[in-house]
């Protein structure tokens, strides 16, 4: 992936990066047709979103904008999300897997279906404006035996067991629910207590 930004977030000067310039110039015609380039012709090689190199190495939940697939995956730090792929960062890999399991549940799906505009055959959208409205159990407040059961169901893609476990978590008297607010980038959950 070619990142046209300096570490401080400024767009690079192509004269200072001849190899990047050669590559970008070879695709200039196509790049100039984009809305972002038409808006600012002097910065025709600018990307719509700034690239954050550290994001690639961070564990994250990957969410497609629209998908008929009920499975949600956690990247342990090998991929960079682009285009219509949202991500959630924060917490440990285990916490992100618990969050993914909860997001795959019928409990969350029913909430999403009631608050989103469904697209492409009735599939809900995973945009942050909708995710902010979800009522979710606090991953740090889930009883350990239920957390292990939920992780086992998630790792086995056993949706029946996952939904049964999620129902037990939601009905548990000690489970706290929180509406999480994004902090930076597309969507970030803060797992601090």
Name these PLM-found stretches.
Residues 1-148, 152, 166:
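Polybasic, glycine- and aromatic-enriched phosphate-binding surface used to engage nucleic acids
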Residues 19, 138-193:
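Non-catalytic DNA-recognition/assembly elements of restriction-modification systems
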């Amino acid at each position: 992936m070619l990142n046209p930004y300096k570490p401080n977030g400024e767009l690079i000067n192509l004269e200072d990066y001849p190899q990047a310039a050669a590559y970008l110039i070879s695709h200039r015609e196509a790049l100039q047709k984009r809305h972002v380039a038409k808006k600012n012709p002097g910065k025709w090689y600018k990307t719509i979103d700034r690239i954050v190199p550290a994001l690639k190495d961070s564990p994250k939940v990957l969410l497609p904008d629209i998908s008929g697939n009920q499975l949600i995956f956690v990247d342990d730090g090998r991929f960079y999300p682009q285009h219509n792929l949202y991500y959630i960062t924060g917490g440990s890999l285990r916490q992100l897997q618990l969050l993914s399991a909860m997001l795959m549940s019928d409990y969350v799906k029913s909430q999403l279906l009631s608050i989103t505009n469904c697209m492409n055959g009735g599939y809900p959208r995973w945009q942050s404006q909708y995710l902010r409205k979800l009522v979710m159990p606090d991953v740090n407040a889930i009883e350990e035996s239920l957390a292990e059961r939920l992780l086992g169901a998630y790792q086995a893609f056993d949706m029946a067991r996952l939904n049964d476990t999620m129902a037990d978590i939601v009905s548990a008297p000690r489970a706290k629910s929180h509406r999480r607010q994004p902090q930076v980038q597309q969507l970030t959950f803060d797992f601090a207590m």
